[in-house]
């Protein structure tokens, strides 16, 4: 088990990608604190993982919630080795022209409060404990941090901001604490929700036909599941194999950046020779 004896705190760990990260960390021997707004999601984790989990119901927009999560993590497990900032919201590809004038400020504030400020607050709260453990922080980005079209104008701007945050924190905290990011593409089974300010709070990205949308444009030929993405979070949290790794963002999106102009990939031609 690659995380035996390690302790992590995962924000947004009650569903979707966050839940897959928590499940995988526990399977790899870690003990995990989870900050999530869903009491039901936290209870499901507790029933499944028992004493390996500490659940904290709270709001990632609140520094007090983050501080409570860190305090309860350290109280239960004695330390904090790895912060995983993962909680987020989506804008359902909403273009600037489609955001009403009277809602644009509110929508901007909601997006950046959760997707950017939420990470900054998590980092602020976790810093003393991470300094003591000489640990690391991992932040979920998105392929929207690299390319247009993975979200609308608000989501894409926010994810680009997160990449800047990762690089700046890696600079400010090195060499005591490593800071990195992971940028998934479309995630099958994700429960990422929309902005309340745009009346999208009851929509989930899981309703999108992601596999049909992505299989023709990704060199891998399909979208990946949350469980398939979770392994990268294990690697980034390990100590022995990641000593030189800080300020990096893994573009972990099925090869979107290497697709061709006319075809996503040419691997099918290999079948003519070797199939």
From Swiss-Prot:
PROSITE patterns listed in its UniProt record: ADH_SHORT (PS00061)
Keywords: Aromatic hydrocarbons catabolism, NAD, Oxidoreductase
Ligand binding (NAD(+)): 9-33
Gene3D superfamilies (alphabetical): NAD(P)-binding Rossmann-like Domain
GO MF annotation: an example: oxidoreductase activity, acting on the CH-CH group of donors, NAD or NADP as acceptor
Claim: Repeat is one of the keywords in the record: no
Entry keyword annotation includes Transmembrane helix: no
InterPro entries hit by this protein: BphB-like_SDR, BphB_TodD, NAD(P)-bd_dom_sf, Sc_DH/Rdtase_CS, SDR_fam
Pathway: Xenobiotic degradation; toluene degradation
Binding site for substrate: 142
Highest taxon listed in the record's lineage: Bacteria
Active-site residue list: 155 (proton acceptor)
CDD domains found in the cross-reference section: BphB-like_SDR_c (cd05348)
Single Gene Ontology BP annotation: toluene catabolic process
Catalytic activity field: (1S,2R)-3-methylcyclohexa-3,5-diene-1,2-diol + NAD(+) = 3-methylcatechol + NADH + H(+)
EC number: 1.3.1.-
Family: Belongs to the short-chain dehydrogenases/reductases (SDR) family.
Annotated protein name in UniProt: Cis-toluene dihydrodiol dehydrogenase
Protein's organism: Pseudomonas putida (strain ATCC 700007 / DSM 6899 / JCM 31910 / BCRC 17059 / LMG 24140 / F1)
Gene name tied to this protein: todD
């Amino acid at each position: 088990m690659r995380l035996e004896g390690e302790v992590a705190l995962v924000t947004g760990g009650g569903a979707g990608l966050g839940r897959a990260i928590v499940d995988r960390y526990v399977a790899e021997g870690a003990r995990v604190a989870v900050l999530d707004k869903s009491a039901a999601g936290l209870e499901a984790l507790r029933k499944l993982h028992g004493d390996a989990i500490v659940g904290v119901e709270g709001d990632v927009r609140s520094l007090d919630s983050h501080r409570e999560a860190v305090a309860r993590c350290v109280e239960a497990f004695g330390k904090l080795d790895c912060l995983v900032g993962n909680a987020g919201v989506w804008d359902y590809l909403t273009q600037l022209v489609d955001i009403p004038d009277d809602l644009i400020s509110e929508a901007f504030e909601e997006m950046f409060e959760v997707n950017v400020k939420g990470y900054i607050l998590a980092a602020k709260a976790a810093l003393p404990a991470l300094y003591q453990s000489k640990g690391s922080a991992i932040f979920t980005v998105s392929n929207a941090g690299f390319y247009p079209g993975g979200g609308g104008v608000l989501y894409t701007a926010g994810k680009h901001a997160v990449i800047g945050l990762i690089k700046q924190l890696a600079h400010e905290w090195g060499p005591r604490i490593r800071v990195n990011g992971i940028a998934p593409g479309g995630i099958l089974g994700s429960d990422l929700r929309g902005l309340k300010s745009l009346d999208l709070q009851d929509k989930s990205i899981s309703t999108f036909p992601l596999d049909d949308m992505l299989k023709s444009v990704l060199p891998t030929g399909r979208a990946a599941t949350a469980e398939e993405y979770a392994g990268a979070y294990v690697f980034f949290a390990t100590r022995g194999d990641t000593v030189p790794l800080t300020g990096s963002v893994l573009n972990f999106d099925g090869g979107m950046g290497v697709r061709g102009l006319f075809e996503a990939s040419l691997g099918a031609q290999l079948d003519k020779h070797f199939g």
